[in-house]
A protein has these predicted regions:
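Short, solvent-exposed coil/turn segments at beta-strand boundaries
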Residues: 38-41, 107, 288-294
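Cysteine/selenocysteine-centered motifs that mediate thiol-based redox chemistry or coordinate metal-sulfur cofactors
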Residues: 317-330
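Alpha-helical scaffolding segments of alpha/beta enzyme cores, especially the outer helices
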Residues: 123-133, 153-156, 179, 199-203, ...
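Canonical Radical SAM [4Fe-4S] cluster-binding loop centered on the CxxxCxxC motif
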Residues: 59-97, 299
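Radical SAM enzyme [4Fe-4S]-AdoMet core and its adjacent flexible, acidic
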Residues: 6, 11, 161-313
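N-terminal [4Fe-4S]-dependent radical SAM core
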Residues: 2-71, 273
Length: 330
């Protein structure tokens, strides 16, 4: 029996692309194909707004190449968020983006670039241009503070089509900020379950925010010490109000951790879940820490491995371990 999976209108964006469920409100969308490739027993089609469609004649999707990756390129950041799962610091190290493994990315791979603050990496522009030459689809996640400080530079990079999606971790929602976000069609606001609440989400809607990605709270890194009962209460409150939250935005997405914490599956029929859920961590995706030269199933995996000679060999290793039920530390 043939199968089809669709990730709709999710800009090739930001961190935790693995397994996102995107449930758009009904709206006509006109899309241009920007990439088509065969992956194992299925075909992948990517559109200019980030929509991705998988199609197969079989009963399941069996990949033989990486589709998307979360990539850390720096551990330097001057903000010091107390919940940062990467433990980034003002004197954190940058990755060497001349590492030859970069050249092994296959065309149309979606690369979610993060840190730290990726905007402070001295090789960022050259790196983005190289990924464009490789026909990859890079995106970035930045903090609101850095988005405001580097707005003109970000707009220039976007206009040069050096990245396709921009995830912005929000700290203080204002009208000026929302207006700036609206200038980048590929921008998606990132919020963390437990650190945001229903009223904040309603305020975003009132200010015209259209795309939101809810990330699960990572009890990892500095986030482990910062976690408390108030955060858990906020998570519980979001979960209890998901029926209302799902109506607020044109596109609402969740990473795998938020899917679990907020019980997102309960919002969908079995048919919708089969269509929109894009897979578990490590099924089509992986995490690469270019600073420490290791890789894992996800950014919260405690089990990490030294970089291999190609990106795809690393993905196939993660997938094989996953299929063998090897504990990967998530």
């Amino acid at each position: 029996m043939s199968q089809i999976q669709i990730l709709i209108a999710q800009s090739v964006v930001a961190q935790n692309t693995a397994g996102e469920v995107t449930k758009p409100n009904n709206k006509e969308v006109y899309m241009k194909v920007v990439g088509v490739y065969k992956n194992g027993n299925y075909k992948v089609t990517i559109f200019d707004n980030g929509t991705k469609i998988r199609e197969t004649e079989d009963d399941e999707f069996i990949p033989n190449r990486l589709e998307s990756v979360d990539m850390k390129i720096t551990n330097k950041c001057d903000i010091g968020c107390p919940f940062c799962h990467e433990k980034s610091t003002p004197d954190g190290e940058h990755a060497d983006l001349n590492n030859p493994v970069i050249d092994t990315f296959l065309p149309y791979t979606e690369i979610a670039i993060g840190g730290g603050n990726p905007l402070c990496h001295p090789q960022l522009e050259d790196f983005l241009r190289h990924l464009k030459e490789l026909k990859c689809f890079p995106s970035m996640t930045v903090n609101q503070k850095h988005f405001i400080e580097e707005y003109d530079r970000i707009i220039q990079l976007y206009n040069e089509k050096l990245f396709y999606g921009l995830g912005i971790s929000i700290t203080n929602l204002t009208k000026d900020f929302a207006d700036k976000v609206s200038q980048i069609p590929g921008a998606v606001i990132h919020v963390i379950a437990g650190l945001t609440n229903l009223e904040s989400l309603k305020q975003m809607k009132e200010l015209g925010i259209k795309k939101v990605l809810i990330l699960g709270y990572k009890v990892f890194g500095r986030g482990e010490d910062f976690y408390n009962q108030t955060i858990q209460d906020n998570i519980n409150n979001l979960r209890d109000n998901m029926q209302e939250i799902k109506t607020l935005f044109e596109v609402l997405s969740f990473d795998n951790l938020a899917i679990e914490q907020l019980n997102v599956k309960s919002l969908m029929s079995d048919e919708e879940w089969a269509e929109f859920y894009m897979g578990d961590d490590g099924g089509y995706t992986m995490y690469i820490d270019m600073v420490n030269c290791n890789y894992g199933q996800s950014s919260t995996s405690t089990q990490r491995f030294e970089l291999l000679n190609t990106i795809n060999n690393m993905f196939l290793d993660i997938r094989a371990k996953k299929l063998e039920n090897v504990k990967l530390g998530d």
